[in-house]
Amino acid sequence: TRDCDENQYDFIMSVGGDGTLNEVISGMVDSHKKIPLCILAAGTVNDFANYLNIPNSVNGIVEMIKNFNVISSDVGKINNQYFINVAAAGMFSDISFVVSKEEKKKFGPLAYYFKGMTQLPQQLSTNLHLNVTVDDESFEEDAYIFAITNTNRVGGFDGIIPFADIN
């Protein structure tokens, strides 16, 4: 993504899940790419793609590319890391990083729930002290989980943040 020449391509395609999409977005933002992004949802949960109702059938994907519709989306940044769907810390926020490819292949989205249940005792002891600064305003707070989201889908759950909007 970082090295592509925008003048040679009509769009960049992200093939994978939310993690892959985040990596592609990070490369695009870091290198100031203004080329459209096409999402092929091939991950386990695909929260961002599902929020956008991106098809996952071959025919649906072909139609999507033929009738390419460009939309804008905000991209967030926390501690020099970009995110397009969600940035989280605290309880259960590390689950997506500890579920193996084998577990995802065998159990699909349930792999995340199984892993979360096995780690519940450790997760209950998770506590964060947050120092948040937005523009010129700051506040401190203790919390079990902290999340900023661009859509209403997080961890395969729909409607978590009803008023979330990608732009």
Feature roles, as predicted:
Residues 30-145:
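Catalytic core of DAGKc-family lipid kinases
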Residues 23-25, 49-50, 157-158:
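Short glycine-/acidic-enriched loop or helix-start segments at secondary-structure transitions
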Residues 3-5, 29-30, 100-101, 162-165:
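Short, solvent-exposed amphipathic alpha-helical segments in soluble enzyme
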Residues 18, 146:
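Short conserved active-site loop signatures built around small residues
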